[in-house]
Amino acid sequence: MAVSQSSYRGCLLGLAVGDAMGYTVDNRSWQEIQEDYGPNGLLGYDLVNGYADVTSYTQLAAFTCNGLLFGLTRGQMLGKMAPFIKYVGMSSREWAASQRPWGRPTRNYCWLLRKAELCRRHCMDTRMLDTLSRPALGLSLIHI
C-alpha cells in the first residue's frame, strides 16, 4: 500500500508542479516561448504577485483528490465505501457544474466549492464539461 500511496502522491505533485510552471506557455510554439523567455525557454515559475495561477487542470486535480479522500474517509468512518470511481465521478460533476455559466451544483460534497480560486471559470471545453456532468460517470467501469 505504501508504494501505491507514494506513486499517487508523486503523480499529483508532478501534475501540480507541471501545471504551475507550464500554464503560461500552454498552446504556444517553441519559437514563441523562446521569444518571451530566452533561448532556453521557461526555466522557472512565471508568478503573478508572487503566486502561480490556478488553472482548470489544477482545479480538476484538486476535485479528483477530494473525491478520493471523500471515499477513503467514508470507508474509514463508516466501514463501507463504493468503488473510488463513484466518488471521483461525483467530484468531477461538481467541478464541471462550477465551470458552467449558471453556477454551482445544488448538492455539494466538495468543500473546494467554497474556495473561489478553485471555482473560477477556466474550462471552456463543452465536450469535456458535458462528459463530466453525466450522472453515469464511472458506472461502465463498475459493472465490468
Residue ranges and their predicted role:
Residues 1-142:
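Structured, active/binding-site neighborhoods that engage oxygen-rich ligands
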